[in-house]
Amino acid sequence: MSNQVISTIEARHCKRSFLKKEIPLEIIKSVLSSAANAPSSKNTQPWQVAVLSGQTIKTLSDTMLAKFDQNQYEKPDYQYTTDPISDIFRNRARACGFALFDLKGIDRTSKEQRKEHDRQNFLFFGAPVEIIFFLPKNSERGNFLDMGFYMQNVMLGLLSNGISTCPQFSIAEYPQTIRCVLNKTEDW
């Protein structure tokens, strides 16, 4: 028996190379709207979304790359994982990283190759559209769960329309830059 939802979930994985193909804004709007059926505490839907393409995505990319290339980092608004990370999770992350580097032919001992790989994050891996999700400043863990449900719906909705995705924490290393380029207040 075939189940389209399960098939879509099983097909979802991170893409790190995208076609130079325009994505109709109507599809993105439809997916974002449908994805809002995700559960959130008291139906608060505490997120905001910015959809970037064209000159806006180029401006953000260029601005972050200029800082990245000079080893200038900002403080992320939130910590992504525990510090220190437990051995079981560290081992999983290493295995994933080793497999990715092997697949891409990256020598793990080459700082230059690793830096170029990391640099691709700020080029959004060539994606023609970037969707950035925001939560209010001082959000709590539950708000992150709510937004995570929404983000997963967005990724699955896009995939069901033939559009792959790659969620990225790396750009969260530049929260002030993102807010500046996108004219967001410090409250987000």
Question: What are these regions, as identified by a protein language model?
Answer:
Residues M1-W188:
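Acidic, surface-exposed loops and disordered segments
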